[in-house]
Amino acid sequence: MAPRRRRRAARSSRPLLLALLAAAVNNFAPAGGVEVLAKSRLESCARGGSDDGRDRLTCDSKIVVDLAVPSGSASLVARVAEVEENGTEAGEMPIRDPLIITINKSEVYALYDLTYLRDVAYKPEEKFVKTRKCEPEAGANVVKSCERLRDEKGSIIEHTEPVCCPCGPHRRVPSSCGNILDKVAKGKANTAHCLRFPDDWFHVFDIGRRSLWFSIRVQVKKGSSESEVIVGPENRTVVSEDSSLRVNLVGDFAGYTSLPSLENFYLVTPRKGVGGGQLEVLGDDFSRWMLLERVLFTLDGLECNKIGVGYEAFRSQPNFCSSPLDSCLGDQLSKFWEIDKNRVNNSQPPQYVVLGKFERINQYPNAGVHTFSVGIPEVLNTNLMIELSADDIEYVYQRSSGKIISINISSFEALSQVGSARVKTKNIGRLEASYSLTFDCLSGINPVEEQYFIMKPDEKLIRTFDLRSSTDQASNYTCQAILKASDFSELDRKESQFSTTATVLNNGTQIGSSENHTKGGIWGFFEAIKAWCAKMWHMLINFFTGTTCSTRCWSFLKFVIHGLLLVAVLWLLHRKGLFDPLYYWWDGVVGSEAQERARRRHKRAHSHRHSHHHDAHKRHKTELAGHRRHHVLHIHDDDDPVAAAAAAEHVILRRHGRHEAALGVQHRDGLKLNKHRRHGGKAVALLPPGEIIVRDGGGCGGVEHGDRRHHAWH
């Protein structure tokens, strides 16, 4: 009998083994991949402390089935119809109510944590205005759309002033400088350049840790009763309410293809609407969602040719005026979207746009409005252990009581910050035991994984869970922590409430202009005074440092320097005699004529002045002189002709002296008049050889001397 009983004991597990294998192979061969890894019967015993201080060992028998369940909504139905009871000779006995085990596994998703960083412009634009007298502080009447921007408070946004470039064919914008008259009358031509952002913005999210999400539902049906549990990465071990079923998610088998890792990428999604200051629902327009490497971004806006470039980087680029237009605005979002658009039109897969690159985008059932998940196309096997009975293996685990002491959760900003839940637990039993802790929120918070740990008697331990909001709105949440014993039975449960603040949009250094700022009132007056004081202080500093003059006075200094240089060159050429032929020609053309006209004008003026003052006097003197001369001649005519001639000569000489003094007659030969000497009763006048011409201004008479000749005329 003994050998026979040993033979039956050896065969005791075979009917169950065959039943499970038949169910797996016959019912689900088309599903492909559902494999039964191991089956056994084991004696499961638990040792726990009692009130009387003694350890107690409680055992029960269960069936353990270890399965490899693939992804893709795979199912397994096992029907346990026969069992063999140990120690009996009845053999296999049918079960009145066979056990039917049904396993369903959902699609597998890769879920990525998102952290909001800032907003960036889709396509920054460089605007330029051809103008004159461009200055960074110039108003709209000079630089037009490149005028400095102001925020909603009316304050000037830093680094938004235009950059002024001179004219020329090889400048940033080739332009004509015009002629010299335009420069003098209107000012030197130049161009004003500025950076502006149109109203097309994208959210930028940092992609953090990756986690897998799927769910496995296990149902055990016996007659009219049914037990069901659902396990997943966030809740790996579950016991049914009637304790007849225990399912443990052991882990996943690695596949041949690695899962997409996006830690080095940023996710950009279009922003819906303008303004509001709040993130909106991202929607399902995945054709504009893009994954771009982090090195393509500048979050501080201080680098050119990167997404997120700001005003300061645009103005500070080297060789600004000699660089081509848009030299700082390369590699923007618009460029990458256009690249993928052309690839799709050519029947090629996209490189950056998520649509067409991944499957089942954001179809994760518990996805929030700001979550990112993609489907895993590869078949991923999950190791699942189902406990129904035990026989072949005996093992002992220690079970001890425990409780949750406190839960501390601080408020945090939705999407842009990560919350932290600190759960403090304590082992209140007398044995060292293992525990599991789950943290579950009703909605709005991404699920977190269950944690396993060991505590010694009276030991307190704090476990931390990272909380990430799936919405950008401020909200209140209620979550509960569940402490389980080593046999996965629930020991304690505690609820906690916390709140999140709304996500605040941040454009970084790409600040746009606000047209809604208000001015006026007492605050506007104070702001004006503040701005004036700041301007005066700035001007004072620039006066001592020379900063303003180096920028504003440079054009004037260049004009003065060039003018002085031109004058110096012309003076040197003049000293060398280069312009002498020109001088001679000019004198020949206009010099003699000008001198003649000047002489005639001078003569007319001189004659006119003397004619008014001396005409009457001259006429009187002329008549008187003529009368005297006639009287003298008349007196001496009859008595002595020689004396009459001498008297006439004397009268002429007297007139000659007066005219000489009045008209400034110069004697070329030094005229000398000798005294009258009486010789032979005659008066003789001795004159030196020379020529003296004395003419009366009125033309009435004159004296002319020449080579011992004397002429007198009336």
From Swiss-Prot:
Compartments, record wording: Endoplasmic reticulum membrane; Cell membrane
Entry annotated with the keyword Thylakoid: no
Transmembrane segments: 553-573
Domain of life where this protein originates: Eukaryota
First and last residue of the signal peptide: 1-33
Basic residues bias (residue ranges): 598-619
Keywords tagged on the record: Cell membrane, Disulfide bond, Endoplasmic reticulum, Fertilization, Lipid-binding, Membrane, Signal, Transmembrane, Transmembrane helix
Disulfide bonds: C45-C59, C134-C164, C146-C194, C165-C321, C167-C177, C304-C328, C441-C479
Name under which the protein is recorded: Protein HAPLESS 2-B
Species: Oryza sativa subsp. japonica (Rice)
Lineage of producing organism: Eukaryota, Viridiplantae, Streptophyta, Embryophyta, Tracheophyta
